Amino acid sequence: MVIKVPATSANLGPGFDALGLSLNLFNIITINESPIFCISLNGEGSQNLNLKKHNMFISIFNEITRKFDTKLPNFRFVFENNIPFSRGLGSSSAVIVGAIASAYKICGIKIDKNKILNEALVYENHPDNIAPAAFGGFVSSVIYKNSVITQKSEIGEDIKAVVVIPDKQMQTRKSRTMLPKNFTIKECVTNLSHAAFLTSCFVKKDYKNLKFGCIDVMHEELRMQNLPELFEVRKIAYENGALMSSLSGSGSSFLNIVYKDDAKNLAKILSAKFPKFTVKILDFDNGGFAFE
């Protein structure tokens, strides 16, 4: 059995813990019966022995299969990790969603993405990454009576993501401690209005106006102070055709959306300016996790 789970970018500026989208960059997990339990790691984290000893995917997979009381053989898990860790690209969400979906498949349970998403909420209590990891596309989410309700819009093929990935990690939990506990009504209204406008742009595929929707006054500036180069990334992106430019999740990655014809030029400029950073041109994924 093979499952692929996409990277995701959340918040998108003002949509704190509510908005996210899916990128065409996947972790691929292969699970086969084996005489003994074993794990192989390739790609991101392959040299990290702790990922073998304390593997979150295996832990969640085992927890879910035990719930179904299914007697299972030993498995060999092969992880091809392409999503960078702790860079704001949904690496933990990919693990959570992938583990739950794999457990359902192995146990013969019908794959219901809504059910899997709500199961994932137990492990990550904000849906902005887990929702697009499940469904793909641009997703807005709310939590109502402890359940996630989502709306998905497919993203057009005329735009691409130019993602800047710094060499510095940024832990979401630590990043959240930097944020104020209270906001003014003006700040809240500003973010609400921009998040609503941004959502409308994605739904209508009116990408030329994305830059007016991705403005945030609650978290981005504070988080970007950990890596001041990101302010320059945003400035350069807008000077070279970016439709929107925002911190990806809690960082450290930065998401720039451009028309596809502008992607190579922006990536070239950003790579030259920030040689220590990785710059990727990515399509958007409209499917979410999938079995192959």
Swiss-Prot record:
Kindly report the protein's main subcellular placement as a broad class: cytoplasm
Top-level division of the source organism's lineage: Bacteria
Q: Where is the protein found, in the record's own terms?
A: Cytoplasm
Single GO cellular component annotation?
A: cytoplasm
Q: Entry's Pfam families?
A: GHMP_kinases_C, GHMP_kinases_N
Entry annotated with the keyword Phosphoprotein: no
Write out the GO biological process terms.
threonine biosynthetic process
Q: Pathway, per UniProt?
A: Amino-acid biosynthesis; L-threonine biosynthesis; L-threonine from L-aspartate: step 4/5
* Keywords on record: Amino-acid biosynthesis, ATP-binding, Cytoplasm, Kinase, Nucleotide-binding, Threonine biosynthesis, Transferase
- Molecular-function GO terms, alphabetical: ATP binding; homoserine kinase activity
Q: Which family does it belong to?
A: Belongs to the GHMP kinase family. Homoserine kinase subfamily.
Q: What does this protein do?
A: Catalyzes the ATP-dependent phosphorylation of L-homoserine to L-homoserine phosphate.
Its recorded name reads Homoserine kinase
Species: Campylobacter hominis (strain ATCC BAA-381 / DSM 21671 / CCUG 45161 / LMG 19568 / NCTC 13146 / CH001A)
Gene this protein is translated from: thrB
